[in-house]
Swiss-Prot record:
PTM annotation (Phosphoserine): residues: S14
Official protein name in the record: Probable transcription factor At5g28040
InterPro entries, sorted: GEBP, GeBP-like_DBD
Compositionally biased region (Gly residues): 22-32
Keyword vocabulary terms for this entry: Phosphoprotein, Transcription, Transcription regulation
Extent of Acidic residues compositional bias: 33-62
One annotated GO biological process: defense response to bacterium
Length: 427
């Protein structure tokens, strides 16, 4: 019974098995196929991509990206060296990497080639002014202060002068540079004047320095404080003896310029040969605001090699308008006038002629005789008594005139001395 039952079951299932497997051998093969339907065997390349990259499409992958390079497996060989395997097509030669990619190199290049702009403070110390520019600047400033002369309360301003001189000079400069240049030229002039006052013998080193000093003397011998380049730390030479009275006007103002054994210019009474010191005078004396002109020694004939330490020109200004300097100047002019020298020469010649000869030879005496005396001396040698008498009388008359003139000069000197002694603020 049992065997029949198994046969019945087998026969009932056999048609299905025959349809599916197609025989006994096919039935086993069909069983394997049915059990393997849910198993997917990946391809070798797909398995590798699934393990490392979720995106299987290599089209969107950057070949030079660090992720692609770090993705390559590294193996260590037996020799101790490390071999890095790169994916196909992702290796980039080192030479092809641009040098501009280094940001540090960019910064260094910019620092080397970048030049900071030059500010005004650095331009002040550069050589902007040539010798011709200095002369033109001083001449223009002299004309400006002559036309715009200010007093103690309203001195001339340098702002209009800057606008005026800017169009005349062929260079670019600002007002600060102009003020600095004028201040340096003023200090340069004061250094020369300080050497005069100390009695030192100095000489100009170039014609340009001579011309600069001449123009500067005309500017700063007559001006006090000027707006725009005041330098109150260093006073002018003519400002050292300034005295203010109670009313605020200038009192007894004396200016002395002296030097020993130097050549003197008869036009302005100052030395023509001086030297400019490289050191700058920085003496702190005081402060002055008013105009103080300096009187030259005199406008008369002055011999060369005059010792100005002994022959001093003194200018005195009284509060009531009288100018003592003019009086002294006229007195000195009378003392050293050509007529006085002619009188002295004539007197010397007459004394020598009266003795009957010329000591040491006639050439020495003839050198000091005036042309007016020569005809008389020739007549005296010729033995003509009438001519000698006429010349003698003429000389007596001339000497009397000179004597009276000397008396007038002495009276003026005495009156000046008495005036100085009786002045209330003369001390």
């Amino acid at each position: 019974m049992a065997s029949d039952q198994r046969d019945t079951d087998f026969s009932a299932e056999s048609p299905d098995l025959e349809e599916d497997g197609g025989g006994g051998g096919g039935g086993r093969g069909g069983g394997e196929t049915e059990s393997d339907e849910d198993v997917v065997i990946p391809e070798p390349n797909e398995a590798e991509d699934d393990d490392h990259d979720p995106d299987p499409d290599p089209e969107y992958e950057d070949l030079n990206s660090p992720s692609m390079i770090s993705r390559a497996p590294a193996t260590k060989s037996s020799s101790g060296t490390v071999t890095v395997a790169l994916p196909a097509g992702s290796a980039v030669p080192v030479a092809s990497i641009p040098s501009d990619s280094d940001q540090k190199w960019h910064r260094m290049t910019e620092i080397v080639h970048q030049r900071p702009p030059i500010d005004d403070s650095r331009r002040l110390f550069q050589r902007l002014w040539t010798d011709e520019d200095e002369i033109e600047l001083l001449r223009g400033f002299l004309d400006y202060i002559t036309n715009h002369r200010g007093n103690s309360s309203h001195p001339p301003d340098t702002a209009p002068f800057y606008e005026q001189i800017k169009s005349k000079l062929q260079l670019e400069f600002n007002k600060n540079q102009l003020v600095e240049k004028l201040r340096r030229l003023k200090k340069k002039y004061r250094n020369v004047m300080s050497k005069f006052s100390s009695g030192k013998e100095v000489f100009f080193k170039s014609p340009h320095d001579q011309a600069t000093f001449d123009i500067s003397r005309k500017i700063w011998n007559q001006t006090g404080k000027i707006i725009g380049f005041e330098d109150n730390n260093v006073m002018d030479l003519e400002e050292t003896n300034h005295v203010n009275n109670a009313n605020g006007s200038s009192g007894f103002n004396v200016s002395v310029i002296g030097n020993a054994n130097v050549d003197v210019d008869s036009e302005n009474g100052l030395e023509k040969k001086v030297t400019i010191s490289r050191k700058r005078s920085r003496s702190r004396i005081g402060k002055i605001d008013e105009d103080k002109p300096v009187l030259a020694p005199c406008d008369g004939v002055i011999p060369n090699a005059v010792n100005l330490n002994e022959n001093v020109a003194v200018g005195c200004d009284f509060g009531d308008g009288r100018n003592l300097g003019v009086l002294i100047e006229e007195t000195v002019k009378n003392c050293v006038s050509p007529m006085i020298k002619e009188m002295m020469n004539s007197t010397t010649g007459m004394m020598m002629a009266a003795t009957g000869g010329f000591p040491g030879g006639g050439a020495h005496a003839l050198g000091v005789l005036s042309p007016m005396l020569m005809p008389s001396m020739n007549l005296g040698f010729g033995g003509k008594g009438v001519g000698d008498e006429r010349w003698r009388r003429q000389q007596i008359l001339e000497l009397e005139v000179y004597s009276r003139r000397l008396e007038l000069v002495q009276e003026q000197i005495r009156a000046t001395v008495n005036e100085l002694k009786t002045m209330p603020n003369g001390g």
